[in-house]
Curated annotation (Swiss-Prot):
Cellular component GO terms held in the UniProt record: endoplasmic reticulum lumen
Keyword flag Transmembrane: no
Domain spans labelled Thioredoxin: 27-152, 367-496
Stretch list, region Disordered: 498-525
Protein name: Protein disulfide-isomerase A2
Disulfide bond annotation, renumbered to this chain: C71-C74, C418-C421
Summary of subunit composition and partner proteins: Monomer; predominantly as monomer under reducing conditions. Homodimer; disulfide-linked. Part of a large chaperone multiprotein complex comprising DNAJB11, HSP90B1, HSPA5, HYOU, PDIA2, PDIA4, PDIA6, PPIB, SDF2L1, UGGT1 and very small amounts of ERP29, but not, or at very low levels, CALR nor CANX.
GO molecular function, one term: steroid binding
Bias-annotated ranges (Polar residues): 516-525
Organism: Pongo abelii
Sequence similarity: Belongs to the protein disulfide isomerase family.
Length: 525
């Protein structure tokens, strides 16, 4: 120990005798570079605890990515992050992009509350204590636009008809705030929303001639679009003012096409639409007869604007995962399904008749009025479902087994693609083998991507639930360490663990978010 400590003491004495920045001789690789030399990689500042302060002083607008070398999401972000830096540099933007290796700089990770990777924080004017959490997209142009709207105006000031018309003509989605007083609090609300609505272009005016030009007599936010109705107005409440949440919901709802085709480019926006009911028309777009159905589908859509999102799924395209989610085969097209994203309940037309404007309208009304019962997916019960130590449950036998009053049933709800589920599989098998001679204990598993339950919905994987023997259909969710010892203690104590047991381990979300979504794309520490 003393042999290791002596060089450290000598180094401290030498540093105490030399002013920082005036040391002579070459630096060792482990030493930090002088303050004026913050290293760069692909146009990105590489920061440490010694250089973050300097970067904040030199750059009034600094976006910092906290990453981990082993993080797959970080690796996917890296090229887009570098492209964004290049785009902003070409524009001579005041924004600088930087990164911090979280595991190598634990002091910084702790200081800024980093618990998952990647985490991005935006620092303004050297303020180290209150950075803004980055909430934008994970592709280069989206990153650049998010930053542009924070260092520049988020809405263009419109002075005349020509400027307004040029803005409207130049983009698919344009939002213009018509306010008689630009110093009103409602304008601040409008500009705050404009910072984050990156798929729309924003304008702002107080000019009376523009109010007259667009037929307005009071403060109004107008969405101009090059499809469907062409325009949607959101009048500002004269007493309550402009509510950020209400305006946001309005813009999201009316910026969606009345009918949207599901594909990799639209999926993220479909799930972000905040409309809980989605009506899906499954068609084979290579067939003329199927394409003709889209007309009637579109004619029904306006009646349910804001209540039901109308989506077309082409079974001839790469949409097998959507078919699987609804338990359908491509041969079932054309057919309708409605799903509520909050409850995950799915509905199918009862009569199975032709798809027409009238039948679509009637089906939507029936579901919204609670007149249609949801259907549940289930695989067939395997002949050998109870022959292995881990019993196989499906939708059709779950109730009978899980709520058997003579058995204590411990169930793993999993997804075949879930990494966490695969990691815990050996411990689950070992648990089943350990208790296979206990007649009152059943260890089971259920593929929750192929089987649905009326009793509850499964939202993450793995989900572990314990169904103790006795009346009352009691359910206890297991939220502790996933290993044989802790599982055993839980079972032996009747579904209870001592309070000092470790907290729950992470679970994968269900369903998995789209690859380009900003949600769910982080790795926990």
């Amino acid at each position: 120990m003393s042999c290791q400590l002596l060089p450290v003491l000598l180094l401290l004495l030498l540093r105490a005798s030399c002013p920082w920045g005036h040391e002579q001789g070459p630096r060792s690789p482990s030493e930090e570079p002088p303050e004026e030399e913050i290293p760069k990689e692909d146009g990105i500042l590489v920061l440490s605890r010694h250089t973050l302060g300097l970067a904040l002083r030199e750059h009034p607008a600094l976006l910092v990515e906290f990453y981990a070398p082993w993080c797959g999401h970080c690796q996917a972000l890296a090229p887009e992050y570098s492209k964004a830096a290049a785009v902003l540099a070409a524009e001579s933007s005041v924004v600088m992009l930087a990164k911090v290796d979280g595991p190598a700089q634990p002091e910084l990770a702790e200081e800024f509350g980093v618990t998952e990777y990647p985490t991005l924080k935006f620092f303004r004017d050297g303020n180290r204590t209150h950075p803004e959490e980055y909430t934008g997209p994970r592709e280069a142009e989206g990153i650049a636009e998010w930053l542009r709207r924070r260092v520049g105006p988020s809405a263009m000031r419109l002075e005349d008809e020509a400027a307004a018309q040029a803005l409207i003509d130049g983009r698919d989605l344009v939002v213009i705030g018509f306010f008689q007083d630009l110093h009103d609090e409602d304008v601040a609300t409008f500009l705050a929303l404009a910072q984050d609505a990156l798929d729309m272009t924003f304008g702002l005016t107080d000019r009376p001639q523009l109010f007259q030009q667009f037929g307005l007599t009071k403060d109004t936010v107008v969405l101009f679009k090059k499809f469907d109705e062409g325009r949607a107005d959101f009048p500002v409440d004269e007493e309550l003012g402009l509510d950020l949440g209400d305006l946001s919901r309005f813009l999201v709802t009316h910026s969606m096409r009345l009918v949207t085709e599901f594909n990799s480019q639209t999926s993220a926006k479909i799930f972000a639409a905040r409309i809980l009911n989605h009506l899906l028309l499954f068609v084979n777009q290579t067939l003329a007869a199927h394409r003709e159905l889209l007309v009637g589908f579109g004619e029904a859509a306006p009646h349910f604007r804001g209540q039901v999102l109308f989506v077309v799924v082409d079974v001839a395209a790469d949409n097998e995962h959507v078919l699987q989610y609804f338990g359908l085969k491509a041969e079932a097209a054309p057919t309708l399904r409605l799903v509520n994203l909050e409850t995950t309940k799915k509905y199918a037309p009862v009569d199975g008749g032709p798809v027409t404007t009238a039948s679509i309208t009637a089906f939507c009304h029936a579901v919204l009025n609670g007149q249609v019962k949801p259907y549940l997916l289930s695989q067939e019960v395997p002949p050998d479902w109870d022959q292995r130590p881990v019993k196989t449950l499906v939708g059709k036998n779950f109730e009978q087994v899980a709520f058997d009053e003579t058995k204590n049933v411990f169930v793993k709800f999993y997804a075949p693609w879930c990494t966490h589920c695969k990691e815990m599989a050996p411990a689950w098998e070992a648990l089943a083998e350990k208790y296979q001679d206990h007649e009152d204990v059943i260890i089971a598993e259920l593929d929750a991507t192929a089987n649905e339950l009326d009793a509850f919905a499964v939202h993450g994987f793995p989900t572990l639930k314990y169904f103790p023997a006795g009346p009352g259909r009691k359910v206890i969710e297991y939220k502790s360490t996933r290993d044989l010892g802790t599982f055993s203690k839980f079972l032996d104590n009747g579904g209870v663990l001592p309070t000092e047991e470790p907290l729950e381990e992470p679970a994968a979300p269900f369903p998995e978010p789209p690859a380009n979504s900003t949600m769910g794309s982080k790795e926990e520490l």
